[in-house]
């Protein structure tokens, strides 16, 4: 990366037109910006892929039709009183300072299984290193396209994570640098 602020997204997500703008606007060293995402149904995902546009989600609040977390899909700039805080990170909608990430040696490459561990690991190491989670819910809006999930048994990842926490290992050994 060539910038001082890093934004993380997944390839199976569609971003609101102001997604990047909001991550940049609220960027501040010592913070991790945490957003959420709407999980679109198979039918709505197909429609989005065909048209290139996300339709108005208001009807899906009343009748979700296979969608979930629809309330996360509304851009609410200037309505802080409507937004809830973020307690945890989702790796597909987060951003942070390159300097803060380098201080903990980046992502731990020992997490080999998908789905569980990586997001939580980066969250607790960054927080232990003094960073705070700041919510960009309903600002950095993201839509997750439907696909079959490929969840595996993640017990191995969680055991590894708990070992690192018990040892208070904030700087990972198998990250950007191999220590």
Each predicted region: which residue ranges?
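Short aromatic-enriched loop/helix-cap "lid" or pocket-rim segments at secondary-structure transitions
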Residues: 44-48, 147-148, 154-157
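Catalytic core of nucleotide-sugar-dependent glycosyltransferases
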Residues: 116, 139-140, 153-178
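Short aromatic/hydrophobic "clamp" motif used to bind/position activated sugar donors
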Residues: 6
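Active-site donor/metal-binding and catalytic loop motifs
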Residues: 40, 136-153
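Short, flexible, basic/aromatic active-site loop/helix in glycosyltransferases
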Residues: 53-86
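The conserved acidic donor/metal-binding loop of glycosyltransferases
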Residues: 10-14
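Conserved donor NDP-sugar-binding/catalytic core segment of glycosyltransferases
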Residues: 18-58
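A short, conserved alpha-helix in the catalytic core of glycosyltransferases
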Residues: 88, 93-105, 112-131
